A protein has these predicted regions:
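Extended, histidine- and acidic-residue-enriched regions that form the cofactor-binding/catalytic faces
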Residues: 1-59, 63-175
């Protein structure tokens, strides 16, 4: 966001919302979550606060799968109440990144996963001191592309990680 705002005159970047809906991770220790209703309301209230300050072009960037539905609902409600406001959202940056980067950037599952190849590569690039590559694992769940199956994360993995973090690199993260 900071790099983009440096190139776009007049762009305001707000601090990230660091807690949202994570109920599907509740089977793992220390998973913090807000309800769907609370998450939706927080997003709605923040957008409405920005609108009250005269901002009419809003772009939301999401970094967490649990917030996709709340962002969709909040932004739709905002558009209904404030039809003059232009609002757009990138609700799944991880899918967009895998699709926009050269096809050979990621080796497994198009870089997808929770702490998978893509996210871990970004961490290796931005925060190498926080990373422990020796703990990287590979868990590729068998999920259909055509249907959105609802699952608890513990049904997919026993580590809270999916994708192939063993293929991650700082070079991929820089891209």
């Amino acid at each position: 966001s900071k790099q983009i705002s440096d190139r776009v005159d007049g762009m305001l970047v707000l601090p990230p919302v660091t807690v949202g809906y994570s109920g599907h991770y509740d089977s793992f220790p220390f998973s913090l979550t807000l309800s769907y209703d609370t998450t939706t309301q927080v997003i709605y209230d923040l957008i409405e606060s920005v609108i009250r300050n005269g901002i009419t072009h809003i772009f939301l960037m999401n970094g967490h799968d649990g917030n996709i539905a709340p962002i969709e609902i909040a932004s739709r409600k905002i558009k209904e109440k404030y039809p003059e406001v232009q609002i757009a959202a990138l609700t799944q940056w991880w899918v967009a990144a895998g699709n926009l980067l050269p096809k050979d950037t990621f080796e497994v599952w198009n870089g997808l996963g929770h702490a998978g190849e893509g996210e871990t590569s970004i961490a290796y690039y931005l925060f190498p001191e926080w990373c422990e590559p020796e703990l990287a694992t590979c868990v590729i769940p068998s999920l259909p592309d055509e249907i959105d199956i609802k699952w608890d994360f513990s049904e997919l993995t026993d580590t809270a990680q999916t994708g192939d973090a063993t293929k991650a690199s700082a070079e991929k993260g820089k891209k």
